[in-house]
């Protein structure tokens, strides 16, 4: 009769049970029905299971290591018995960030292994540095490797954010409103206003952007302008966009300085995408550590411990995100079981880089369409009419080690233009930037800049120069200017000194020069606040006009609790003024900052200017808008008043909410249902945001992953039980507005004394409410949490009889003593016969 087939689960259980029965072969004990493989007797039943095939775990083991405590599972292998020969049918590798990695050669050998037989020692050699060892006693497969066969576990420099968490239509509207009034000295005045709107409506990763402004609202000169009307999809590392936008909003990888003002109607496509996040905070040169077993890696610089990280066995790249920027050496120390295994010096190369960061793949973008060029004029000398033209171009950017570059080639109005941008750090102290433009009408431009940190770390220097010559087609002006400046930190030489900064600008085209020199020193810093000294001079000369010189000196006093005060003097326009300024900041409330300033001429000839001027301002942060109100009376006698306010509105389905924040064009609506001024907090990626009332909208940056956790607010007396919807994980694209509707119970800790209708105390009685139960003490007193939506307590007795206490908790917050309360429906406690739980529930 044929043997019964085993299911995969039964095979594994049966096999693990049989390994304990295996014995070394012995002539007197050998069973004629058993088979011997690798020195182990295989019973016939287990032999049949092997013939059917079974899966065994695959572990990586470092050659020379004692025991298997540091082995790591890296996959599984399917083994089977074929005509008395044990073989591996296939190996399935399992990727894990914490596991050791094998070299590419070893990995290829493993993945291509098929029907490979074990030798008599139950071993399959793979390379000179790796082999497979099968243990039938433990029923596991080991990949035994030397260090040379190990790969390196590198940290990912890029990651796609994945699909959107919002699968329905939603929208974010950002608004910015401003109004200003100028009151003239002769009594006249003028008022103007504007309203800018930016709307992004999205369905998953698809979104449409509308951006425009209204000007002169309420006046006879009202105007409007649409700056962008565009469809965009940025997903999985590629971006497509199509529609209308002005040249100020044109996205490009490389410089595009020769594009004149106007509107573009066209398309673009490329891999310059925000949906792929590049990590540029790691060292460009990986810091690698080898661990023969699980242990620690210590990074030390100049005797200072910078980082301690834990790793399993293998070659691992050390996380350098938290290390300081710069190029420097660190000592990498590997510690296993409390002993230093190795110590070596490696170089960290972390520099601020533009774009996608060092090591990112080549980025590219192609674009084109119809170009409406606006009318152009240069100081009234040159004038070009508005014109329609074609536009087409391509951009690309990349990096090699610390060197980064970008290039753009495009054409319009029968002109071809090429532009490049190069950035090259030289060591850790010097950074060189070059930007060039060349056009077919003989136009060219060169912008060069060098910044350097001088030895000792107490000073820095920068030099910039621009030269531009424009031919007869491009709508751009010539330029010829240079600038030089630096900062000297004298504090590093002597602690009582401060910081001195100087700059010089020379515009040779307009024959203008501008000098500045500033000095700042901290005079006092302690428990009572800080006192700083500021002094400076500016000198400006334009063409043949006489030089204009301004000077100032001021003392800045910063006090605890957000107070700031400044007093000083300035000299400009031929007279000297004394200045006073004060500012107060608030952590809570609608008004966040108030300030005022006052200036009075104390010497010199003021001419037509007033001797007294000043102003006041306030910054506010309300539920639906935030902004600034400013009133200022200038020395020329004009009184200027302006108000700015901005905010956002989020919408999805039946849910709509507004906010005074404008953090991004995506967001979350929290429909908490809290009554009145109830408050909880939302913890989003580690940041805490207050949520007040029934519904809140929180704008967030698009192309981001967010971990959202609702919790009680430390600033509220109320206590809430967040039953469901406490934690959420969101991926948001532009225009995505997620809705979180948690089940929130407002809890009040109620204490009191409960009586029957005749006044007798309910002693040692088990009482219940909507969410829990408790027991009174000998005096009928109790303490229990109550949901404010269900402010009742009941007591069940005599089987199915119930009495109930109705609590008045409308104004209660946190904890409340309700005193004596009556359980209506229970005439007397003495009349209740209590036998254990018989009269309680």
UniProtKB/Swiss-Prot annotation:
Transmembrane residue ranges: none
Upregulation: Negatively regulated by H-NS. Positively regulated by IHF and EcpR.
Domain of life: Bacteria
Residues of the signal peptide: 1-29
Alphabetized UniProt keyword annotations: Fimbrium biogenesis, Signal, Transport
InterPro entries linked to this entry: CarboxyPept-like_regulatory (IPR008969), Pilus_assem_C (IPR031917), Pilus_assem_E-set-like_dom (IPR032636)
Function: Part of the ecpRABCDE operon, which encodes the E.coli common pilus (ECP). ECP is found in both commensal and pathogenic strains and plays a dual role in early-stage biofilm development and host cell recognition.
Similarity comment: family membership: Belongs to the EcpC/MatD family.
Protein name (Swiss-Prot/TrEMBL): Probable outer membrane usher protein EcpC
Record organism: Escherichia coli O6:H1 (strain CFT073 / ATCC 700928 / UPEC)
């Amino acid at each position: 009769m044929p043997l019964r087939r085993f299911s995969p689960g039964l095979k594994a259980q049966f096999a693990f049970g049989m390994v304990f029965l295996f014995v070394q072969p012995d002539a007197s004990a050998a069973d004629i029905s058993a088979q011997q493989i690798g020195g182990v007797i295989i019973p016939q039943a287990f032999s049949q299971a092997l013939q059917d095939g079974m899966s065994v775990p695959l572990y990586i083991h470092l050659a020379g290591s004692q025991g298997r405590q540091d082995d790591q599972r890296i996959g599984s292998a399917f083994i089977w018995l074929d005509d008395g020969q044990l073989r591996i049918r296939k190996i399935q590798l399992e990727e894990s960030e914490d596991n050791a990695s094998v070299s590419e050669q070893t990995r290829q050998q493993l993945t291509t292994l098929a029907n490979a037989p074990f030798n008599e020692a139950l071993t399959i050699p793979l390379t000179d540095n790796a082999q497979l060892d099968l243990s039938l006693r433990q029923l596991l497969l080991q990949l035994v490797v030397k260090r040379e066969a190990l790969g390196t576990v590198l940290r990912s420099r890029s990651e796609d954010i994945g699909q959107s968490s919002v699968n329905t239509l939603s929208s974010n509207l950002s608004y910015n409103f401003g109004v200003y009034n100028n009151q003239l000295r002769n009594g006249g005045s003028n008022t103007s206003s504007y309203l800018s709107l930016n709307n992004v409506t999205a369905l998953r990763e698809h979104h449409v952007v509308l951006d425009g402004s209204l000007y002169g609202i309420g006046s006879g000169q009202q105007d409007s302008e649409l700056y962008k009307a565009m469809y965009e999809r940025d997903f999985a590392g590629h971006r497509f966009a199509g529609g209308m936008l002005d040249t100020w909003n044109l996205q490009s990888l490389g410089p595009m300085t020769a594009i004149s003002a106007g509107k573009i109607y066209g398309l673009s496509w490329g891999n310059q995408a925000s949906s792929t996040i590049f990590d540029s905070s790691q060292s460009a040169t990986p810091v690698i550590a080898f661990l023969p077993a699980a242990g620690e890696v210590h990074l030390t610089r100049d005797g200072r411990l910078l980082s301690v990280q834990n790793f399993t066995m293998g070659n691992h790249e050390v996380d350098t995100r938290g290390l300081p920027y710069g190029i420097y050496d660190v000592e990498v120390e590997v510690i296993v079981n409390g002993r230093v295994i190795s110590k070596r010096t490696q170089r960290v190369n972390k520099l601020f880089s533009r774009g996608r960061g060092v090591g990112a793949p080549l980025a590219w973008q192609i674009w084109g369409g119809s170009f409406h060029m606006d009318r152009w004029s240069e100081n009234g000398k040159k004038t070009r009419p508005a014109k329609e033209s074609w536009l087409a171009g391509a951009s690309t950017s990349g990096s090699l080690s610390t060197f980064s570059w970008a290039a753009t080639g495009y054409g319009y109005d029968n002109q071809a233009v090429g532009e490049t941008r190069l950035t090259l750090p030289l060591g850790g102290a010097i950074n060189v930037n070059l930007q060039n433009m060349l056009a077919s009408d003989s136009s060219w431009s060169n912008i060069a800049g060098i910044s350097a940190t001088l030895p000792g770390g107490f000073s820095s220097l920068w030099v910039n120069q621009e030269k531009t010559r424009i031919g007869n087609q491009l709508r751009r002006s010539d330029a010829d200017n240079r600038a030089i400046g630096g900062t000297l930190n004298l504090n590093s030489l002597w602690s009582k000194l401060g910081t001195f900064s100087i700059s010089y600008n020379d515009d040779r085209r307009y024959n203008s020069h501008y000098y500045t020199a500033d000095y700042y020193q901290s005079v006092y810093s302690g428990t009572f606040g800080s006192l700083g000294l500021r002094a400076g001079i500016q000198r400006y000369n334009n063409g043949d006009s006489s030089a204009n010189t301004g000077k100032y000196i001021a003392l800045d006093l910063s006090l605890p609790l957000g107070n700031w005060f400044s007093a000083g003097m300035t000299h400009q326009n031929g007279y000297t003024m004394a200045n006073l300024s004060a500012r107060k900041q608030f952590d809570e409330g609608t008004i966040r900052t108030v300030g005022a300033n006052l200036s009075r001429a104390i010497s010199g000839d003021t001419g037509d200017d007033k001797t007294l001027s000043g102003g006041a301002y306030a910054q506010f942060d309300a539920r639906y808008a935030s902004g600034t109100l400013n009133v200022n009376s200038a020395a020329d006698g004009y009184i200027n008043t302006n108000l700015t306010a901005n905010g956002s509105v989020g919408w999805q389905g039946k849910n709509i909410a507004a906010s005074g924040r404008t953090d991004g064009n995506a967001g979350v609506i929290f429909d908490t249902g809290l009554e009145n001024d109830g408050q909880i907090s939302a913890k989003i990626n580690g940041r805490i945001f207050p949520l007040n009332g029934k519904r809140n909208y929180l704008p967030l940056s698009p192309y981001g992953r967010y971990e959202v956790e609702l919790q009680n607010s430390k600033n509220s007396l109320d206590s809430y039980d967040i039953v469901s919807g406490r934690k959420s994980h969101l991926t948001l694209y532009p225009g995505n507005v997620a809705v979180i509707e948690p089940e929130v119970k407002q809890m009040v800790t109620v204490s009191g004394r409960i009586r029957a209708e005749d006044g007798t105390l309910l002693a040692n009685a088990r009482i219940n409410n909507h969410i829990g139960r408790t027991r009174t003490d000998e005096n009928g007193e109790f303490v229990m949490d109550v949901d404010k939506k269900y402010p009742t307590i009941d007591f069940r007795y005599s089987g199915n009889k119930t009495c109930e206490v109705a609590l008045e908790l409308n104004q209660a917050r946190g904890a409340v003593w309700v005193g004596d309360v009556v359980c209506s429906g229970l005439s007397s406690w003495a009349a209740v016969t209590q036998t254990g739980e018989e009269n309680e529930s």
